[in-house]
Amino acid sequence: MTTMGEDEAPALPKKSPLPEKIDEADVDDDPDDKVIKIVVVGDGASGKTSICQRFAKESFDKSYHQTLGLDFFSRRITLPHEMQVLVQVWDIGGQSIAGEMIDKYLTGANIVFLVYDVTNSKSFENAVDWLSVVKKNTKSSETPVKLVLMGNKTDLEERRVVSVEAHKNFATSNDMMPTYVSAKTGDTVFLTFRQAVAEVLNVGLSRAEVEADIEIVQGSVIEQPKQSDASYARRSDQSRSTSVCSIT
């Protein structure tokens, strides 16, 4: 399997298999904070690291960075009733599917994001293998692990090769939360993280809160490429197939 990025790049120095230290956001842990561990898996080049960076740092890096083993991100978010949650994100390199550390990476996960590239059919086909690995290594978890199927690169709608129907059917048949994101534009990235965390903690998000997350992204986009009618129709269908948690 390849690793994330649009172009090939020289191999980078190998990282330690587990993080030696955590992000600065964890240094001043509040004992009252809830802590949620999200593990992000999927083929290389599907955009996993870009999604994590968009969530944790609200940025998008166009340059290629190969993930070897594991990258670690974290961010505090606020849910209704002033609930503070520390979200720890484990970004797993695409080559790790056959690695001996994959079980360690998945240990203690509350949520798993299975990411694929909507413009790459192979990354979607390989989702079956990734899901099998995830289920094998989380079956003994004390609490059920929430599974999320995440189609990335929706900003490249005109190059889509994985249909909305295939995405929805795969998610439904495997009891997964279906969602689409664009790491490049930020479209629904933060919302998806927030929804998944809220569902795990049994916290409902109001319609106003969901729409506020969407508006933040839309307000940051200066220019959107003009879409054909067919592209717009696919985009509308895609939006309807994206899960929205407990809107009251």
From Swiss-Prot:
It holds the Pfam family Ras. SUPFAM superfamilies: P-loop containing nucleoside triphosphate hydrolases. The keyword Cell membrane applies. Changing T49N: Expected to give rise to an inactive GDP-bound state. Cilia-related sensory abnormalities and failure to undergo intraflagellar transport. This is Ras-related protein Rab-28. GO terms for cellular component: axoneme; ciliary base; ciliary membrane; ciliary transition zone; endomembrane system; neuronal cell body; periciliary membrane compartment; perikaryon. Residues 239-248 have a biased composition (Polar residues). It comes from the Eukaryota. A motif (Effector region) lies at residues 64-72. It is found in: Cell projection, Cilium membrane; Perikaryon; Cytoplasm, Cytoskeleton, Cilium axoneme. It is a peripheral membrane protein. Residues 1-30, 227-248 are annotated as: Disordered.
